[in-house]
Amino acid sequence: MDPESKPVVLVACKVLLGTVKGDLHDIGKNLVAMMCEGAGFEVIDIGFNADPEKFVEAIKQHQPKVVGMSAMLTTTMRAMGYTIKAIEEAGLRDQVKIMVGGAPVDAEFAVRIGADGYGSNAPAGADLAKKLVGIA
């Protein structure tokens, strides 16, 4: 790929990414964002320490197909479940696929909190996003 060229953006395929409330670690989320952009997604990054309401408002505003949440700490993992619950309570859960990741997170935890998938690293996160929207 020519260094000056930009990746082809998948029409209407937005991925919303954020690190959950209480967590200030965003390197992993940033890597997933870069991988998703490289895969052709439009990425909306709501940053770190994002509370459930910030995710809900961003979903309403940007209408992504995929929402990705990151947590680096065991103490902030629960915020993922709270965020999914807030998305459900806002009536938005059927509009998005949710993927989770981060050092303390695993596939079993993802199932337990109601996520649609788990990415063990940045490339896996981008691959999962493609799978969740049916292009992989």
Summary of predicted features, one role per range:
Residues 1-24, 28:
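Long amphipathic N-terminal alpha/beta scaffold segment
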